[in-house]
């Protein structure tokens, strides 16, 4: 080893072999970070042919990290193979003669890298030009090398042609098999000088060292967010592009990350491996279990920096913070109404489509929102599980309890930007704001009369239908409005209806 920046590997020639004397950069690995053994081949630009395609594909240190992680198949321009490699692990690690010397004129004018064949130089130039002539017919994703396209297409076909002889586990890419085989050999020649942890691959060590240095070399050009690993960066980019390349074969639902698809597949399999030790309730995702367990512990680890209010979930905190900022980033394309959460917008869209996917099994009544269905079911069971700790009054829904508790605290967190009047609930504020805007979104289907509140529309409809839902408990006389019943009951000397 010459210095922290480079080293020379020499192999004594035997019969039928030639001397290999290669010097390359170690891309920032400090002295001592690379130890002996076969890991040394991962730092050489040229690898003896009989070392196997697996070793040749690992020839350039850091190449896999720069181009997308350890699972990347190198193209011919990188020293890999353009086409399928061996279908199982290499038979041996014996050495063969070094590759042929470069042909005259096979040197890149951009970076000076030399190649043994002109075809490799042509393919290498795509690194500089950004050309990607190989397009996937399934999803349209493009690649610079045909070998990368072949590997990518196995995502769609599910093909995993590279099987481990030790355990039978199969992989889409040969480089993934080579990486996996290190778990059997136990060989970890690359040691971190900061913490002493050892790794089987130099590229993994390079990635690991970023946990010590805090380096984040992958920056998003859209929002400036930086990442330590290219794989995390690529997943983040899908937030901007909307790409969801991982689709469920059972229902077609697509996901931006393969891990999310794996979690989703458990729904079809009926698997709920994460059970609550307190009540036995099981969940598909461990995150769901973590959130649920806070209902037993009353833990609320996400406090608001503005007002100190704490929440069980980070998404609840994010939603709450928008009550301070007034931000409503999710806008309906039909009517322009904006919402704090994307899930609220999805539910609101059903107002325009008329979709009511949540039906009651008891009476068949359908609802656009699942929360409304759950609340409705309690009208059949009579359950009111949400009780006020101050006065004992019980409610069918948690939102009803939350709204009621403000009557004890006197808190009115929702203020009108026009006149400053404050309200206990956001729905009350929205109704009030219509007085300023003149909006009357609730229109009678019988006479086209419009109203500010839905309750006013429901009351008005009874003039058309003749419905009288409020009956006197003394004499049985029915009324269309509660206020009329209250007036009537005074004649009996009784109290007004609650």
Curated annotation (Swiss-Prot):
SMART domains: ZnF_C2H2. One of its GO terms (cellular component) is nucleus. PROSITE patterns: ZINC_FINGER_C2H2_1, ZINC_FINGER_C2H2_2. Pfam families: zf-C2H2. A zinc finger (C2H2-type) spans 106-128, 134-156, 162-184, 190-212, 218-240, 246-268, 274-296, 302-324, 330-352, 358-380, 386-408, 414-436, 442-464, 470-492. Signal peptide: none annotated. Keywords: DNA-binding, Metal-binding, Nucleus, Repeat, Transcription, Transcription regulation, Zinc, Zinc-finger. Its main location: nucleus. It is found in: Nucleus. Residues 30-104 are annotated as: Disordered. GO terms for biological process: regulation of transcription by RNA polymerase II. GO terms for molecular function: DNA-binding transcription factor activity; RNA polymerase II cis-regulatory region sequence-specific DNA binding; zinc ion binding. It comes from the Eukaryota. Belongs to the krueppel C2H2-type zinc-finger protein family. May be involved in transcriptional regulation. This is Zinc finger protein 497. It comes from Homo sapiens.
């Amino acid at each position: 080893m010459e210095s922290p920046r480079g080293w020379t590997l020499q192999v004594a020639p035997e019969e039928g072999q030639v001397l290999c004397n290669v010097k390359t950069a170690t891309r920032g690995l400090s002295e001592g970070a690379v130890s002996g053994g076969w890991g040394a081949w991962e730092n050489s630009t040229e690898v003896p042919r009989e070392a196997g395609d697996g070793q040749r594909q690992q020839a350039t240190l850091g190449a896999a990290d720069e181009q997308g992680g350890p699972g990347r198949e190198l193209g011919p321009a990188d020293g890999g193979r353009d086409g399928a490699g061996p279908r199982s692990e290499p038979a041996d690690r014996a050495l063969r003669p070094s590759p042929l010397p470069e042909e005259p004129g096979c040197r890149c004018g951009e970076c000076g890298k030399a190649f043994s064949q002109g075809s490799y130089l042509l393919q290498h130039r795509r690194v500089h030009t950004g050309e990607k002539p190989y397009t996937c017919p399934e999803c349209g994703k493009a690649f610079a090398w045909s070998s990368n396209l072949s590997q990518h297409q196995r995502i769609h076909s599910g093909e995993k042609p590279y099987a481990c002889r030790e355990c039978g586990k199969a992989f889409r890419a040969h480089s993934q098999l080579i990486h996996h085989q290190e778990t059997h050999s136990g060989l970890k020649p690359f040691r971190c000088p900061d913490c002493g942890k050892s790794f089987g691959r130099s590229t993994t060590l390079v990635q690991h060292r970023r946990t010590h240095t805090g380096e984040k070399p992958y920056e998003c050009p859209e929002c400036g967010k930086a990442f330590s690993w290219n794989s995390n960066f690529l997943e983040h980019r899908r937030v901007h592009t909307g790409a969801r390349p991982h689709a469920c074969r059972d229902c077609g639902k697509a996901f931006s990350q393969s891990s999310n698809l794996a979690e989703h597949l458990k729904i079809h399999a009926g698997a709920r491996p994460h059970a609550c030790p307190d009540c036995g309730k099981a969940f598909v995702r461990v995150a769901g279990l973590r959130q649920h367990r806070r209902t037993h512990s009353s833990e609320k680890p996400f406090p608001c920096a503005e007002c100190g209010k704490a929440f069980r979930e980070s998404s609840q905190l994010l939603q709450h913070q928008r009550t301070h900022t007034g931000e409503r980033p999710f806008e309906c394309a039909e009517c322009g109404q904006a919402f704090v959460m994307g899930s609220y917008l999805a539910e609101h869209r059903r107002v325009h489509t008329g979709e009511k996917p949540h039906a009651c099994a008891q009476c068949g009544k359908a609802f656009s929102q699942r929360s409304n269905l759950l609340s409705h079911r309690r009208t059949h069971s009579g359950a009111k599980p949400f009780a006020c700790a101050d006065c004992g009054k019980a409610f069918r829904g948690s939102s009803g309890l939350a709204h009621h508790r403000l009557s004890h605290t006197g808190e009115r967190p929702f203020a009108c930007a026009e006149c400053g009047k404050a309200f206990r609930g956001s729905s009350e504020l929205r109704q009030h704001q219509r007085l300023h805007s003149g909006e009357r979104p609730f229109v009678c289907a019988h006479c086209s009369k419009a109203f500010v509140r839905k309750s006013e529309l429901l009351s008005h409809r009874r003039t058309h239908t003749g419905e009288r839902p409020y009956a006197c408990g003394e004499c049985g006389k029915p009324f269309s409005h509660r206020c009329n019943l209250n007036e009537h009951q005074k004649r009996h000397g009784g109290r007004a209806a609650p």
